[in-house]
Amino acid sequence: MSEGLYEKFLAPDEPFPLLSQQRGSVSEEGCLDVSDFGCQLSSCHRTDPLHRFNSNRWNLTSCGTSVASSECSEELFSSVSVGDQDDCYSLLDDQDFTSFDLFPEGSVCSDVSSSISTYWDWSDSEFEWQLPGSDIASGSDVLSDVIPSIPSSPCLPSKKKNKHRNLDELPWSAMTNDEQVEYIEYLSRKVSTEMGLREQLDIIKIIDPTAQISPTDIEFIIELNCLTDEKLKQVRSYIKEHSPRQRSTRESWKRSSYSTASTSGVSGASVSSSSASMVSTASSTGSSGGNSASNSSANMSRTHSDSNLSASAAERIRDSKKRSKQRKLQQKALRKRQLKEQRQARKERLSGLFLNEEVLSVKVNEEDHEGDVDVLI
């Protein structure tokens, strides 16, 4: 079935007029001299496969879409027909088929031909000729069986993503701009969430010793040019030293050392009573050494917390105390004046001197004087 279809496709019944006129230019080996043709071999024209099969003609149209139609003559759109099976074999087997000088040097079509020849390698290794294995009615694409496969362009190699580096081990100068911004944001979150106000101020002083911070500031902007390798090293060591885990360890060590010192200092009942009286007057003289040590530690922790108050908080406390004192003084003065008025009214009522007293209201309308009055005359 395939051989009959192959012969029907390559060996039509009627001779073609184009090749019948050019029979003298075909050599014995079957090479076609196409120097008289003014066409350019370019990409195959995608016509209807059934129409091209029925017309028994292999159309190779010329002049690609990049060439203006005004610059191409009518001969450029002529078709080359292969009417003999031997000629078709010779065309396929000839290695020098692309060496035909179809156009004179310097013409527009020669430039297009050179550009196409660099894109399409017309060697036998690139041709993949396939014969249809079934009838056309079965849906096989004749065009895909005849047109040689175009070599696909090589895919661009995908760029490998940079691995995420450990920024805690890199110096400041070895980081890129994006890594510096990312690390600054990481430090800001870590310091603001895990450390207190004093530690934050210390880190700001390390980064920018000339920074001026007011009590009303709620944020501090870190400039990238302020940091260096040495400053970043100091900040890392400070954060490592004052991390919450290290701070809890130090506080537990201080509490244990203070408790051992207080228990060793208290030796008798007299010493315990004196320490208790120094801490609070409400404690009894006969309290044990453990009670006195706990009271003294509580008092010291309270004074330590008071000393850690910020200046703004202490100022607010002083203002509230001052306002409460002024309010008490005003209430005391008002109460004193009310008592004095009540006492005076009682005296007047007991004396009886003001029983016939009448209160008159006088209203005086002042008239506008035309001129000034000299009171000295």
Curated annotation (Swiss-Prot):
InterPro entries hit by this protein: FAM199X_fam
Record's keyword annotation contains Ribosomal protein: no
Pfam family, one: FAM199X
Signal peptide feature range: none
Region (Disordered): 240-348
Coiled-coil residue windows: 321-350
Keyword hit for Coiled coil: yes
Superkingdom of this protein's organism: Eukaryota
Compositional bias segments (type: Low complexity): 256-301
Biased composition (Basic and acidic residues): 240-254, 339-348
Composition bias, Basic residues: 319-338
Keywords linked to the UniProt accession: Coiled coil
Family classification: Belongs to the FAM199 family.
Name of the featured protein: Protein FAM199X-A
